[in-house]
Amino acid sequence: RMGVWIEMPQFSADGDVAEIALNYVRVQNWDKTYTVIPAHKFLENSFKNWRGMQESGGRRIKRSIFIDMSTVRFLTREEADRFRRFELLGDYIDSKERELAAWNSEHAESEDPVNSRRLTNIGTFRAYVTAYLRANPNIHDHLTFLVRQLAPTAEGLPLEIYVFTTDVRWAFYEGIQADVFDHLFAILPEFGLEVYQSPSGRDLSGLAGDARRRITESSAEA
């Protein structure tokens, strides 16, 4: 129908239906160009119709933060006490500590980390992200809501956020998504975690400089 957003990559069409004729459909793409598609191609090829998203009142965010796995560790007692003072984490810390204490009293033979269950910084961060999104009025609470770990990769441990915004308009949706991830990237160091990223030219230059310095010092000592 007119005005519906459709996506048909095989014809480089991605935008709103601007005209429907007997033998063609004209689509105005987001870059303001037009794509004319023969009507019979809609019977021969698949296409994505975004009308369902627009009418549902929710637009999906599906994006991951890749955590440097070398920074994943158990929480110290001091850190657990500090996180308990976080408004979004107090209930989680209390309930999780009760759960772990009950399990450890029944199953653990000692307080050694190998034999007991303890709070971790990655698990606590995941709980924080969940609580933060639940408290965000721009995130739907009755559509699919997931904060989950995916399989580890060479680029780190993906923590995926799969939620829906309450505003489906493109610019507003992008703003909501950016605000969420701006906050999460900024708060991540509070949990002793770091985002994984591939070494840049500056990183490699620093390593090369350190290597040259060590070689020079070794030569001088010799």
Whereabouts are the PLM-identified features?
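Soluble accessory domains appended to multi-pass membrane transport proteins
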Residues: 2-109
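Long, non-transmembrane cytosolic or organellar matrix-exposed soluble domains/tails
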Residues: 84-222
